[in-house]
């Protein structure tokens, strides 16, 4: 059927909303119009033939061909068909033929591009895709603050980050300013630029933007580039080279792809899942929007390509340099894409970056910004917040909110910051944490991020841990492996048992393990030796250390509830300088009031009123409570109105776990000859009643120069030492060491400490656990805010990562995001 042709007087192109456009004519009407006589120009001259774009809703009344590839290019005149890429970008049928027809000069260029696209990409290598990827001109913004106009570059200029950073109106391809003529900035901006900002413009875009040479490309080499917002035509996105797969269009999921490492980037930074990978904490799918992203940016739900391109770019830029705040201005030069859509990308990157900043995905950690460099726009600055507690959770939230530009006051009951982080630097050459010091799983762990920001190195623990019996004999590794296997088998049976059990059917974990163990002995007829029984007790003591409680208080149904969520993978490390380095940096420049225990929180009025025990009053719009679970359970803070029954039930369904530590410095390293460079060694308990006493001894100096050991008291043993003074605990510890190294003389320590977390009035615990009859849901309930006014953070509010400094820190980041959004 013949294409309808319209003939009329040439008109200037100007802005239209699709809603104001006339209804489309039927084919018959269009054909009739094509035969109508032509009008004449106002000056009486002959009219110029032209054709409208046939894309419904396109505002271009007189399209102009951007390609100018064919000698017969229609330019702004008549063509038999316009090909629509966006409301301001079209190419004519003559230029289409130039590349698409095999007898034309441009055909070889098109087919070469098509082969590259097909071998790397997944989407169709259509002529429109070719034009968008290879022929559309680049747009760039003048960097003069008083100008900031968008200019279309000539075809021969390839946009680079350097050009984008330095471009001024009138700049030549060699980046030199044109000879003095007129002020190029005074020239008006192209009218099409204004259209790009309209909400409907993006919906009229035929193809989503695919970034060229994205910083994210090396991290995403195992993906089809066009599925993660990148152009398949760039060498940086050459998937075949990256995966060693030369087969066009096929994606090999090799094992090597699961551990992508980019030179110069911290090996613990792995922000993107690789194909077929799962279960890695703080990882995002580069080809899928997360639920909270869809909620924030619903306009990308149908085609998320632009969002993914910009989000992936932002994440890659952040992890390339996490020591400086990432701003829109730093991202924009790396947005390399042809066409007017680059303008839209630049506009959108600001929104996306602010969202990711608020969520704590970027611009987080110990990053500190000046008063004129707040990370969020002024709309967020009109809030005031009181934070109760200066531990990792409170300081994380305070640092985030302060960086956002929100007024924050921190009230801390103790005479120091850190909460359950407290480092002892009095040992010669070694820092020993009285609280946390070990990082379990470093990949994507925010602690690893903060260490990178501070230039701190962590010591990776080795795997070797010899189990030494009282009497000095090292346990045969085959016995250790056998009992480790049996221990894990017991826990596997517990996992099977709980699958169909409700909370009402819950039993203590210790009771269930004993029941399964006895049933196994009875059914199998296997008899374990006395030593094997003792080694099993060693593994049970480690489980009590992990839970922070004796196993007869822990839920068999929910003891490892967080394992159902992605956890931190990778190395287990010792933070040799201690967590206090991080804590002090988080606190830098914040308004922190020490010795200010809070007595009452009244949130019944328009503002929250907080009163300390000495009667001092503070008021703010929001309050964040980060005190330990034990203090909430004992009602250390009075709430008005009182906390709901649901929240109090959740608070009391968790246990306030407790462990204690002992550290000892010796005149020399007496253990070296037996331990042979291992980072720790185990103590096989002589009986079940002794199993929580000094189960593992840690060598606190990775350099093996200084002579400091640290051990832990867990389970029932915590209660047994509570009535002893420090010297008596030391005597028990030394008696154990002298049994383990019976063949040699063990010297008296020159210095030591014993922690007393259970009796610290403002702490009273180590970390939380789920009590029998409870569930992991309690963590979420405790974390719920009250009326958008009272918020809660701390390890006991983090269902995914409880019991850790990491979990506490992330809960503070989470609440800062919620507070900023209200």
UniProtKB/Swiss-Prot annotation:
Consequence recorded when altering residue 104 to E: No effect on DNA or nucleosome binding
GO MF annotation: an example: histone demethylase activity
Mutagenesis or variant effect for residue 114 to E: No effect on DNA or nucleosome binding
Region Disordered, annotated ranges: 1-47
Listed cofactors: FAD; Zn(2+)
Regulation: Histone H3K4me1 and H3K4me2 demethylase activity is inhibited by DNA, this inhibition is released in complex with GLYR1.
Name of the protein in its database record: Lysine-specific histone demethylase 2
Stated family: Belongs to the flavin monoamine oxidase family.
Protein localization: Nucleus; Chromosome
This protein's record includes keyword Mitochondrion: no
Binding residues for Zn(2+) 3: 142, 147, 169, 185
Residue span, SWIRM domain: 275-373
Cofactor note: Binds 3 Zn(2+) ions per subunit.
Gene3D superfamilies: 3.30.40.100, 3.90.660.10, FAD/NAD(P)-binding domain (3.50.50.60), Winged helix-like DNA-binding domain superfamily/Winged helix DNA-binding domain (1.10.10.10)
Matches recorded under PROSITE patterns: SWIRM (PS50934), ZF_CW (PS51050)
Catalysed reactions, semicolon-separated: N(6),N(6)-dimethyl-L-lysyl(4)-[histone H3] + 2 A + 2 H2O = L-lysyl(4)-[histone H3] + 2 formaldehyde + 2 AH2; N(6)-methyl-L-lysyl(4)-[histone H3] + A + H2O = L-lysyl(4)-[histone H3] + formaldehyde + AH2
Zinc finger (CW-type): 133-193
Subunit structure: Interacts with its cofactor GLYR1 at nucleosomes; this interaction stimulates H3K4me1 and H3K4me2 demethylation. In contrast to KDM1A, does not form a complex with RCOR1/CoREST. Possible accessory component of the polycomb repressive deubiquitinase (PR-DUB) complex, at least composed of BAP1, one of ASXL1, ASXL2 or (probably) ASXL3 and one of MBD5 or MBD6. The PR-DUB core associates with a number of accessory proteins, including FOXK1, FOXK2, KDM1B, HCFC1 and OGT; KDM1B specifically associates with ASXL2 PR-DUB complexes.
Recorded name of the encoding gene: KDM1B
Effect listed in the UniProt record for changing residue 661 to A: Normal demethylase activity
GO cellular component: chromatin; nucleoplasm; nucleosome; nucleus
Function recorded in the entry: Histone demethylase that demethylates 'Lys-4' of histone H3, a specific tag for epigenetic transcriptional activation, thereby acting as a corepressor. Required for de novo DNA methylation of a subset of imprinted genes during oogenesis. Acts by oxidizing the substrate by FAD to generate the corresponding imine that is subsequently hydrolyzed. Demethylates both mono- and di-methylated 'Lys-4' of histone H3.
Keywords: Chromatin regulator, Chromosome, Developmental protein, FAD, Flavoprotein, Metal-binding, Nucleus, Oxidoreductase, Phosphoprotein, Repressor, Transcription, Transcription regulation, Zinc, Zinc-finger
């Amino acid at each position: 059927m013949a294409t309808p042709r319209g003939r009329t007087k040439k008109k200037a192109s100007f802005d239209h909303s699709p809603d104001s456009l006339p209804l489309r004519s039927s084919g018959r009407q269009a054909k009739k119009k094509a035969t109508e006589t032509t009008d004449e120009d106002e000056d009486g001259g002959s009219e110029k033939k032209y054709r409208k774009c046939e894309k419904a809703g396109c505002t271009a009344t007189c399209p102009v061909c951007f390609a100018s590839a064919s000698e017969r290019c229609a330019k702004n005149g008549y063509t038999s068909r316009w090909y629509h890429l966006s409301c301001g970008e079209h190419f004519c049928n003559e230029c289409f033929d130039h590349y698409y027809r095999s007898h034309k000069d441009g055909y070889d260029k098109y087919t070469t591009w098509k082969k590259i696209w097909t071998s790397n990409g997944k989407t169709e290598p259509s002529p429109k895709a070719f034009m968008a990827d290879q022929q559309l001109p680049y747009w760039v913004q003048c960097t003069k603050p008083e100008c900031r106009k968008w200019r279309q570059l000539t075809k021969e200029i390839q946009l680079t980050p350097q050009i984008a950073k330095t471009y001024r109106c009138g700049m030549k391809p060699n980046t030199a300013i044109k000879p003095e003529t007129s002020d190029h900035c005074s020239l008006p901006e192209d009218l099409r630029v204004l259209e790009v900002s309209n909400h409907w413009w993006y919906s009229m875009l035929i193809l989503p933007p695919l970034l060229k040479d994205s910083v994210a490309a090396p991290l995403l080499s195992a993906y089809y580039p066009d599925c993660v917002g990148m152009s398949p035509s760039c060498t940086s996105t050459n998937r075949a080279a990256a995966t060693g797969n030369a087969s066009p269009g096929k994606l090999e999921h090799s094992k090597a792809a699961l551990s992508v490492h980019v030179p110069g980037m911290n090996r613990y930074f792995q922000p993107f899942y690789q194909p077929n990978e799962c279960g890695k904490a703080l990882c995002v799918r580069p080809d899928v929007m997360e639920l909270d992203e869809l909620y924030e940016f619903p306009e990308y739900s149908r085609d998320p390509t632009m969002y993914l391109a910009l989000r992936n770019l932002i994440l890659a830029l952040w992890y390339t340099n996490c020591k400086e705040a990432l701003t829109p201005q730093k991202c924009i030069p790396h947005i390399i894409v042809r066409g007017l859509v680059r303008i839209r990308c630049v506009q959108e990157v600001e929104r996306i970056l602010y969202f990711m900043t608020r969520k704590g995905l970027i611009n987080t950690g110990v990053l500190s910004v000046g008063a004129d460099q707040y990370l969020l726009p002024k709309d967020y600055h009109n809030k005031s917040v009181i934070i109760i507690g200066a531990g990792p959770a409170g300081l994380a939230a305070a640092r985030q909110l302060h960086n956002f530009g929100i007024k924050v006051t921190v009230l801390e009951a103790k005479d120091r910051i850190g909460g359950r982080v407290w480092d002892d630097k009095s040992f010669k050459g070694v820092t020993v944490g009285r609280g946390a010091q070990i990082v379990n799983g470093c990949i994507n762990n925010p602690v690893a991020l903060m260490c990178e920001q501070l230039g701190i190195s962590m010591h990776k623990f080795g795997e070797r841990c010899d189990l030494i019996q009282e009497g000095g004999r090292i346990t045969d590794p085959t016995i250790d492996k056998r009992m480790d296997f049996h221990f894990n088998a017991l826990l596997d049976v517990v996992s099977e048992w709980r699958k169909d059990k409700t909370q009402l059917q819950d039993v203590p974990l210790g009771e269930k393990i004993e029941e399964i163990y006895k049933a196994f002995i009875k059914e199998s007829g296997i008899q374990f030796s006395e030593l094997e029984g003792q080694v099993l007790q060693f593994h049970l003591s480690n489980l009590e250390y992990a839970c922070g409680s004796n196993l007869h208080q822990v839920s068999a149904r929910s003891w490892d509830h967080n394992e159902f969520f992605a956890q931190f993978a990778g190395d287990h490390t010792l933070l040799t300088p201690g967590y206090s380095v991080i804590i002090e940096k988080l606190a830098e420049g914040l308004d922190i009031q020490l010795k200010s225990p809070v007595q009452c929180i009244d949130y019944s009025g328009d503002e929250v009123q907080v009163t300390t025990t000495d009667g001092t009053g503070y008021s703010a719009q929001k309050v964040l409570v980060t005190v330990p679970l034990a203090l909430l359970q004992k009602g250390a803070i009075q709430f008005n109105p009182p906390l709901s029954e649901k929240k109090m039930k959740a608070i009391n369904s968790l246990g306030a776990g407790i462990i204690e530590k002992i550290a000892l410095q010796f005149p020399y390293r007496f253990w070296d000859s037996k331990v042979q460079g291992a980072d720790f060694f185990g103590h096989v308990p002589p009986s079940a009643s002794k199993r929580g006493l000094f189960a593992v001894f840690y060598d606190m100096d990775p350099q093996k120069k200084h002579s400091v050991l640290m051990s832990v008291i867990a389970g029932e043993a915590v209660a047994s030492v509570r009535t002893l003074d420090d010297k008596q605990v030391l005597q028990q510890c030394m008696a154990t060491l002298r049994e383990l190294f019976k063949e040699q003389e063990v010297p008296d320590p020159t210095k030591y400490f014993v922690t007393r977390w259970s009796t610290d009035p403002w702490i009273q615990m180590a970390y939380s656990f789920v009590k029998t009859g409870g569930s992991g849901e309690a963590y979420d309930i405790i974390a719920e805010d009250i009326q958008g006014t009272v918020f809660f953070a701390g390890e006991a509010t983090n269902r995914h990562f409880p019991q850790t400094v990491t979990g506490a820190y992330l809960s503070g980041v989470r609440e800062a995001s919620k507070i900023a959004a209200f």
